[in-house]
Amino acid sequence: MSATFNFCAGPAMLPKPVMDKAQSELLDWNSMGTSVMEISHRSKEFIALTNQAEADLRQLMDIPANYHVLFMHGGGRGQFSAIANNFLGDKGRALYLVDGSWSSAAVEEAKKLVGEENIDTINIVENNNGINSVVLPSLSNIDKDYRYLHYCPNETVDGIEIFDTINSPWPVIADMSSNILSRKIDVNQFALIYAGAQKNIGPSGLSIVIVRNDMLSLPSLPQSSIMDYKLAVKHGSMYNTPPTFAWYLAAEVFAWLKVSGGVDSVELINIEKAMRLYQCIDELDFYKSGVAVENRSRMNVTFQLVNAELDNQFLEEAKQAGLVALKGHRSVGGMRASIYNAMPIEGVIELVKFMQTFAKKHS
C-alpha cells in the first residue's frame, strides 16, 4: 500500500511512531493485560502516565513553576466559554483581537456570557488588493481596565499566523490550538495558553490549559464544575473522569517530540516544510496566496487555483496521488494544506511535486 499523506486541518494526522506504538499495545498496555482505555483514571499506572505527560510538556515548553498545566474536556470552543466564565465575574471586561474565524468565534461566545458591553474588539487584519496582513495596534493609549487580552496567533481557516509579540498592559490569553509546540515561545509572556489537542497534541476531546497562578484569583461567574479552573487545579485535572485515551496519546506525542529533538528541532523542520510549499505557490502563476508573506501560517498553508473551475479536479487527482484533505474551509474555499508537526517533510515534497505536475498539465 502506497503512503497517504493527510493534510486535514483537524482532527489531524498523528506521528506514525505514536500510532504504531498505540496499535501494538492497544490490548495490553504497560503489561497490565488490559487496554489503557479500560483502566481506572485513578490507578497508580495511569497517574504515573499523567505525571510524565505534564513533566514532558513542561520541559518541551519550558513552563515556569508558577503555571498550572491542566488536561481538560471541551476543545477550543469549550475554552472560549471557560475563559470568560473563569475571569469575567463582577462585570469584568476583556479585549479581543480579531484576525480570523476562530478569534471571532471566541468573541461571540464571550458576548453570550457577559454581554456585548463587556467585550471590546479590534480587527487586526487589513486587506490590500486581495492580500490579508496583520497590523497590531498600539495598546498603550487605551485607558480601560481589562481583565485580559485574548488573541489567536494562528488562524487555521484563513492561513494567518502572528509571529510578533503582543505588547499588552493586560494579561495575555492565547488560543494556540493550531500552533502549540510548533515553534519556541516564551510562556512568561502569557497569562494563559490553551489548545484543543486535535492538531499538534493528539486526538479530539482533550484540551490543554496552561494558566498562571495569579489568574485564578480573578472573580468568576457561576459555571459548570468541569470547566472551573480552580477545581481542575485542586483535583489534578481529575474532578471528573477525563478523556483517558486522548491523554495517553498526548503523552506519547510529547515523548515523540522529545525524541525528535524537542521544539527547537521541530521548528526548523516546520520552517522548511512551509518554505517549500509557499515557494511552489509563488513561483507558479497557476496558484496564488491571499496572505502577506510575513503573516503566512507555517501550519495551515491556504492557497487558490487561479482557475477555480479546476478545484474539484485538483482535489480528485491529489486524492488519487495519496494526498488527501486539501479542500479549503467551506467559508473561504480554495485549498488548504495543514502541515502540523506530525506531517513529515516527505509529504510536503510529494505535494509540491503534484502541484507542479498539475500546473504543467493544465496550463
Swiss-Prot record:
Q: Name one Pfam family in it.
A: Aminotran_5
Cell compartment(s), UniProt:
Cytoplasm
Q: Where does pyridoxal 5'-phosphate bind?
A: 76-77, 102, 156, 175, 198, 240-241
Keyword entries, A-Z: Amino-acid biosynthesis, Aminotransferase, Cytoplasm, Pyridoxal phosphate, Pyridoxine biosynthesis, Serine biosynthesis, Transferase
**Positions where N6-(pyridoxal phosphate)lysine occurs in the chain:** 199
Q: Which InterPro entries match?
A: Aminotrans_V_dom, Pser_aminoTfrase, PyrdxlP-dep_Trfase, PyrdxlP-dep_Trfase_major, PyrdxlP-dep_Trfase_small
Give the protein's cofactors: pyridoxal 5'-phosphate
- Show the catalytic activity: O-phospho-L-serine + 2-oxoglutarate = 3-phosphooxypyruvate + L-glutamate; 4-(phosphooxy)-L-threonine + 2-oxoglutarate = (R)-3-hydroxy-2-oxo-4-phosphooxybutanoate + L-glutamate
Task: Write out the GO biological process terms.
Answer: L-serine biosynthetic process; pyridoxine biosynthetic process
Residues holding L-glutamate: 42
Q: How does it assemble?
A: Homodimer.
Protein name as catalogued: Phosphoserine aminotransferase
Species this protein is from? Shewanella piezotolerans (strain WP3 / JCM 13877)
